[in-house]
């Protein structure tokens, strides 16, 4: 059985540990019965341990109840960069191993419900733990938006990034983030009202900047290059520029130039939102990797209705902990 799950960018500035958007960059996991445990990794993360400590192996063994498995991982998602690689891997491994509740398994094994929700449900999501279960709502997303991701050659673990945060926050800063998150949700639903201030944050980004000192300057360059808003991607060190589709290539070039000027090795990716989430193939179909055309159009207009207006992704869909609508 094969399963594929998308990368994701969590937090999106003010939505700390709550918001995430799925990106069209993928992890595929294939699980088969075998006489002993075999783990193979191709692509990003290929240098990681190919033994029972591998996250895909731990998830698959937990779900299948046996270690007599052959597990193959093919990943496009950079590891330790704030792009939800472990959540995507956990979701795909859980589904390929036969989990009935891949969202619950991924959230438990990865520890990040926001990334896990985006990997399973796709699109823009808000996630929360409620009485020990993951509750998810898929929010409306303007599909004309694209994302420029600065991915530095710097690995930053979520645990280390979290240690940089204060144990307490002021009421003023909590209210600041709540107001910005409201603006952000509205702006992501309709890019015409997306303000650059919508990704402002007082809970985590500034505290993490010492771990990647070039971040503030690069974020400014993303905005100056044409991004509607910019923020850290997850716990970093990757940085996210939210753009109109027509501006994506221009912002990507600005990101590359800013990285070169700041002497930050790495790459700048131009990605669309993934609107499908987790996909499972039990039949070995040749078209499992569907047409890789992005869900956003080259002219930045998104899909259009008969009247010529942009069609947003439908929001307001609630999911329980097992990922079922």
Model-derived regions, located:
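DPxDG-like acidic metal-binding loop motif
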Residues: 23-25, 83-102, 120-125, 130
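Phosphate-handling active-site elements
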Residues: 34-36, 65-70, 96-108, 131-135, ...
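Alpha/beta catalytic cores of group-transfer enzymes, especially the acyltransferase/condensing modules
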Residues: 101-146, 210, 216, 230-232, ...
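Short beta-strand-to-loop capping motifs
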Residues: 33, 129, 152, 241-245
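Glycine-rich, charge-dense phosphate/pyrophosphate-binding loop(s)
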Residues: 187-306, 313-325
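Active-site rim beta-loop-alpha module in soluble metabolic enzymes
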Residues: 148-210
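Solvent-exposed alpha-helices and their adjacent loops that cap or buttress functional pockets
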Residues: 9-12, 20-23, 82, 109-111, ...
